[in-house]
Amino acid sequence: FSGAVAEEDFDPVQLMHDVNGTYTELFTTLCKPEYDSVWVEKSAAVVGEENAEMVAEILKSVCTGTIFGEEAVKAYAEAPEEAVFDCYFQGGVSKFVFNDGNVKGLDTDGNVVFDHNYTYVETLPDTIACYLYKTDDADAGDFTYVALAPDTPATTYHIEFRYGGNYEDMGKLYEGEYAYWMGAGILEDADAEMIDNVIALFAE
């Protein structure tokens, strides 16, 4: 992933404030045809023009998988060279709204899927390098936990996170209920500069 690395002196409570905003799926945005030339340009700066288009497609493909969890574990065990991450939103959520510890999920029609307040619980293992938050709402179900990577719009131009109701699997990247899944979001009002910057980040 492109993101920042969790650090010992990082403030996970502040992180929940630093990600304030409304987010749509990062790769649904970045994979729009109008940004193809930006991907090629940023890739060319790293690998040269000859291989830029191929590399750009590879970079997009590793984050646009369509399976996760046990289905992905089984599929990639049989064909490890095909392993990619699903970085889309799950659970019927189209947009996420972060607001000082409150997280709200909206569907494609703008209806509220969930709306809970979260508090910091712990730092997850280095393999996932995320901070775990939990709501005390008894009916939260698959939205009981939110795990945030230390990415913010101000630092890496996007956010990376996952959510679920299975505490044991929240910190596992390659096994369990959330294997090969890490949602990625970008501010819904991201301007051309932010999109340019985040594509450059993934191309590095």
Residues covered by each model-derived region:
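Low-complexity, serine/threonine/proline-enriched polar segments
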Residues: 47-86
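Calycin-type beta-barrel ligand-binding domains and close structural analogs
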Residues: 5, 31, 76-204
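Short Gly/aromatic-enriched secondary-structure transition segments
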Residues: 35-44
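Sec/Tat-exported extracytoplasmic proteins
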Residues: 19-20, 27-34, 59-66
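N-terminal helix-cap/turn-to-beta initiation motif at the start of protein domains
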Residues: 5-24
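C-terminal segment of classical bacterial N-terminal signal peptides
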Residues: 1-2
